[in-house]
């Protein structure tokens, strides 16, 4: 069973979960994919850059077709990048197990006023559509994230 774990960056808080997936499904069966290999401010704070890791797949415009194939062919996809909703929908249409996880949609400050922005409104529409598939699951990263997604319907 092949698992694709997609995050916007490498986060030391999420690596234990990734390691647990590798222990369950096998070292060679789980790929960590990210468009941002390292953030300069994290490296300055002493975090590893992870650039040389063979388990890491760097998503770039030059390999996006290959990445899309990995996305469609994986048995399980866990994704936290909202902009990949079209890729998620294609997987869902073919009955593949797809998880989306996120933090809050409506963080303090602007909050629900974000819904007035056309891009956010479109994302809400897309994720409401995705949530109608029986093989789509939302994993809330915190109580407020669950509240926000529940608010969207």
Regions found by a protein language model. Name each.
Residues 1-53, 72-74:
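N-terminal subdomain of nucleotide-sugar transferases
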Residues 40-43, 108-115:
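Short, charged, surface-exposed secondary-structure boundary motifs
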Residues 49-68, 83-84:
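Glycine-rich, highly charged phosphate/nucleotide-binding loops
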Residues 76, 91-111, 139:
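Active-site proximal beta-strand in glycosyltransferases
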Residues 79-85, 102-103:
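Short His-centered aromatic/hydrophobic patch
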Residues 83-84, 144-146:
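Alpha-helix capping/helix-boundary segments
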Residues 106, 117-138, 147, 151-152:
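Membrane-proximal helix-turn-helix segments that form the acceptor-binding/catalytic region
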